Amino acid sequence: INKRYNIDDILGIPDQKSLMLNNYQHQSVVENEICDSYQKKDISVNNRELLMVKRCPKDSSEQSPAISEADETESSPDQLSNCNKKHRRNRTTFTTYQLHELERAFEKSHYPDVYSREELAMKISLPEVRVQVWFQNRRAKWRRQEKIEAANHTHNLQEVFPNVGKSLTSSLFPANPYPFLNMSLPSVESTSFFYHQNGMLNPMSMVNNLGFSNFSSLNLEPPKIPMTLPYGLFNEFSNFLSTRSSSKDLNSNSKTCSIRTADNLNTE
């Protein structure tokens, strides 16, 4: 059988008609795949919208026995957002009686226990969870009010007494509250002026003996409270003075005895 061969057949180059046919078949396959993917996406979107519509609560006026397919497919994003908003919990509206009882309970205790909350919830016909949430919100409001009142109070004080902070700090915490401690202490013999006749410490005589004749030179007011030393220091100080005074008395007694014996000897 004689068969003619073209140069394209010998070289293995495909025919132009076959190339066009292959390209057409490939394009049709790709288009079919794209259509299938879009159809799947549309089905998933429709199913999702149907689920959202089923989950959304309906109003009594909008309740119907069935939903048409056109309504299901034509649901817009605004409707979906409305459904999401409807999922949120509605705010609890309290009656005047309920608010009155809640405020009375809050005045008694800001942190009521579970039993008190349950009793109050039964009294005002509310769930215990709602009562607990009300107390949490009321405590937060109370804290905010306390902070605002404290800030206003301090602001008013600063307006009325602008230098009250400085004067209080300077009077309560002076730079040198006891300037006489830096000076040299007197001798032990002069400490007898510190005591009354009953043996108690006299702070005024102590300050005067140390050289402060007037408190106005120190810019200090006379003490309104009796000055006292710490218990241990007072005992040590009094013991020291008593030993010094007793030794002084012994020395004076020995001197007088020696003088008397000498006088007696001279007279004899």
Swiss-Prot record:
Record carries keyword DNA-binding: yes
Protein name per Swiss-Prot or TrEMBL: Retinal homeobox protein Rax
GO terms, biological process: positive regulation of transcription by RNA polymerase II
DNA-binding region ranges: 87-146
Any Pfam family matching the protein: Homeodomain
CDD domains: homeodomain (cd00086)
Entry's localization field: Nucleus
Species the sequence originates in: Dugesia japonica
DNA-binding found in the keyword field: yes
UniProt keywords, alphabetically: Developmental protein, DNA-binding, Homeobox, Nucleus, Transcription, Transcription regulation
